[in-house]
């Protein structure tokens, strides 16, 4: 089929790569270049870089309602459009152009976790199961009818990166199957509990030792790679790069044990073992080395700004 693809981050690149191997990608649409790096120089998105490298037609419109963009989409004449983490709602003027509409690969069991951060929100909530949905877009936020759904348990140590990639890879399989049979398929309306998944804020990476160790571990897994988890020591931010919960008791926020493996901190329930950290302005290091270098010992209180 003639396919237009809408996507932006690195997560979406394998979706585009799989599509172009099975279908004719007549247009790639990504978000405009954004300032990146220390120099804040405008740089293309990962999807835009891939499209340029592969010689695919590429547009980076600031507004999808602009007539110039809509006309370019009409001229490309896609039979269907596919969306994977594009980052903007598609207006009706564009939705009506492909005869078979717009399909969206969404990493949740819709209607749960509609929005920008479904993988992260599922982990934060402690969900035991999630999945991926292939849906037809309408004007709402992930409200359209479903073509296919795949369910899976969330693995005990899976973070947002690993889970998101696993859901995407299965989603690609489902998407290709749907495209093969699209003219004969009828999507079904979403049913069940509706919830939303707004983008993460930087503050949501902060570890509050007043929560349980299990809840903190869920938070750590959910906020990878951004904003990452962190706490404060002597008023300075310390990134928590690797950690795990373990049995034990201790006062929340107070170091209970320092050993070769790491630094055990008390929480509301259980201990949180810090394995690798990165103090503000310094390199990453084993938590045991950080404790020696920064005077962290049993009884030290963490978390205070």
UniProtKB/Swiss-Prot annotation:
- Key words, A-Z: Protein biosynthesis, Transferase
Its GO CC terms are:
cytosol
Q: Which residues bind (6S)-5,6,7,8-tetrahydrofolate?
A: 108-111
Q: Name one GO molecular function term.
A: methionyl-tRNA formyltransferase activity
Q: Which reaction does it catalyse?
A: L-methionyl-tRNA(fMet) + (6R)-10-formyltetrahydrofolate = N-formyl-L-methionyl-tRNA(fMet) + (6S)-5,6,7,8-tetrahydrofolate + H(+)
Q: Coiled coil: which residue ranges?
A: none
Listed EC numbers: 2.1.2.9
The family note in this entry says: Belongs to the Fmt family.
Primary role: Attaches a formyl group to the free amino group of methionyl-tRNA(fMet). The formyl group appears to play a dual role in the initiator identity of N-formylmethionyl-tRNA by promoting its recognition by IF2 and preventing the misappropriation of this tRNA by the elongation apparatus.
What is this protein called in UniProt? Methionyl-tRNA formyltransferase
* Native source organism of the sequence: Thermus thermophilus
């Amino acid at each position: 089929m003639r396919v237009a693809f809408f996507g932006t981050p690195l997560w979406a690149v394998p979706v585009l790569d799989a599509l172009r191997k099975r279908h004719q990608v007549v247009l790639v649409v990504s978000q405009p270049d954004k300032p990146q790096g220390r120099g804040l120089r405008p740089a293309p998105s990962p999807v835009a870089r891939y499209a340029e490298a592969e010689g695919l037609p590429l547009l980076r419109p600031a507004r999808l309602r602009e007539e110039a963009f809509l006309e370019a989409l009409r001229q490309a004449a896609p039979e269907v459009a596919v969306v994977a983490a594009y980052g903007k709602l598609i207006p009706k003027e564009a939705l009506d152009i492909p005869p078979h509409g717009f399909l969206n690969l969404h990493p949740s069991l819709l209607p749960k976790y509609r929005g920008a951060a479904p993988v992260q929100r599922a982990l934060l909530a402690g969900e035991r199961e999630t999945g991926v949905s292939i849906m037809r877009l309408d004007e709402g936020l992930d409200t359209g009818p479903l073509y296919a759904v795949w369910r899976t348990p969330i693995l005990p140590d899976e973070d947002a990166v690993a889970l998101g990639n696993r859901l995407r890879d299965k989603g690609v399989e489902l998407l290709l199957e749907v495209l093969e049979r699209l003219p004969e398929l009828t999507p079904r309306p979403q049913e069940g509990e509706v919830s939303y998944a707004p983008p993460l804020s930087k503050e949501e990476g902060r570890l509050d030792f007043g929560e349980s160790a299990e809840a903190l571990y869920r938070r750590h897994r959910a906020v990878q790679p951004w904003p990452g988890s962190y706490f404060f020591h002597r008023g300075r931010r310390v990134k928590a790069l690797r950690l795990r919960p373990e049995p034990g008791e201790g006062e929340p926020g107070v170091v209970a044990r320092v050993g070769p493996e790491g630094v055990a901190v008390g929480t509301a329930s259980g201990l949180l073992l810090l394995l690798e950290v990165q103090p503000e302005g310094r390199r990453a290091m084993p938590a045991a080395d950080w404790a020696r270098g920064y005077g962290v010992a049993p009884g030290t209180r963490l978390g205070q700004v």
